[in-house]
Amino acid sequence: MKICVPTMGEGGMQEAVCQHFGRAPTFTIVDLDIGVIKVLPNVSEHMGGTGLPTETIFAEGVQVMIVGGLGPKAVLAFNQAGVVVFVGAAGTVNDAVDDWRAKMLAQADLDNACKDHKH
């Protein structure tokens, strides 16, 4: 299973979770099946590039997103693609994955999506 966490840099499991999904500098992908960690730059239009951040995630075959927060458009895009999203992550990638495993994070929906960019 591949899990993705929006992150502040390239520190792998010890990197800080970025609280703004679309503007995360990087995405850290953890493949739980084979123990591989991959860090991808966010090259979406949000960061001066092209495309949407969700497209980067879809291309990697991610099944679970663990985020601090994200907007309703991203929630809908992930839902339509079959990617399950959990909100409320904080700390490091390692902390976020541990919290997800412990069922401490809420599944994302339109009610708990961010309504503005003040997070």
PLM regions and their residue ranges:
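Non-catalytic interface/targeting segments
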Residues: M1-M47, A59-E60, Q80-A81, G88-H119
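Short HxH-centered metal-ligating active-site micro-motif
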Residues: S44-A81
